Amino acid sequence: MAARWADYITPSTLQLAPLLELLLEPVGAAPRLSELQLGLQEALVNAVRHGNGCDPAKCLRVRRIVTPRWLVWQIQDEGPGVPPQARVRHLPQEPAAHTGRGLFLIHHCFDDVRWSPRGNRLQLAARRPRQPAGLIWLSAGLGPSDGDSLDR
């Protein structure tokens, strides 16, 4: 299976349910669906609120990439970017704080989290669950001759 991708451009609003549904389409009923949905929603809300300042004239650009082993989402806003020192992955020290949990949740929900140098593009990756090779071949027409390894 070669990598497949889809690009989405959407106005910077908090009406994210339709976009989330499209982004999660390849996940299906995987055990991690709720976890990935939570992480993606948090990343999208952060991009709208903090990156684009809830300005509907600005857009979010999202790319979904599906490979045999990974599901990857790249979320880019039009903001100035998150500085490296603010890309923390721990909970706020003040338990009553109203903000500061988003990046912690994002890091918890995904297997790999990376930032662009500018800090306005976030890449989130989740390992795909291993499936018996025979089922993959029957459902997708793949086999060893297609370059897909048996040792996923």
Q: What do the PLM-derived regions correspond to, one by one?
A:
Residues 1-38, 138-152:
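Bergerat-fold GHKL ATPase/HATPase_c domain
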Residues 31-56:
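Conserved ATP-binding N-box helix of the HATPase_c
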Residues 59-69:
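Short beta-strand/loop element within the Bergerat-fold HATPase_c
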Residues 69-73, 120:
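Short beta-strand element(s) in the Bergerat
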Residues 72-99, 137, 144:
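Glycine-rich/acidic phosphate-handling loop/turn and adjacent ATP-lid/helix
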Residues 88-116, 150:
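ATP phosphate-binding glycine-rich loop and adjacent ATP-lid/helix-beta elements
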Residues 120-129:
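Short C-terminal beta-strand
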Residues 129-135:
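Short, charged/polar, Gly/Pro-enriched secondary-structure boundary elements
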